[in-house]
């Protein structure tokens, strides 16, 4: 399996959390976006969830209630993931204002690729769905407290 890493993120951070399947590769364009966002923010970020195995392995994605068409699931012959969930390494930085800043940094870093961006109270989902010919998508968790 091809290992991948960037300036700030290493292959081990993208591995499936099932601990059994060995999947750990995400699209290199996604890693570039994450690195650019990290450079912009100037603070450490952490991958909560990288590639996730599906029914062909231990079905970690299904076990955690992930979408059947999740961008975390391996795509193509290379079995690479196209999405990750990311947050700040320091929990004190996970305020609504900072989560919004992370969202904006990812959106800027991803141009011109059509991204999927999901805003949650303590993490952001980001994927490079445009590389699969899909349109961009934006959503927010109903519990996200917009900064005032």
Region spans (language model):
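Helix N-cap and loop-to-helix transition residues
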Residues: 10, 27, 53, 95-98
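Extended, low-complexity, intrinsically disordered C-terminal regulatory tails
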Residues: 31-66
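Short amphipathic alpha-helical surface micro-motifs
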Residues: 28-30, 60-63, 106-111
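Active-site acidic/histidine clusters and adjacent loop/turn architecture
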Residues: 1-44
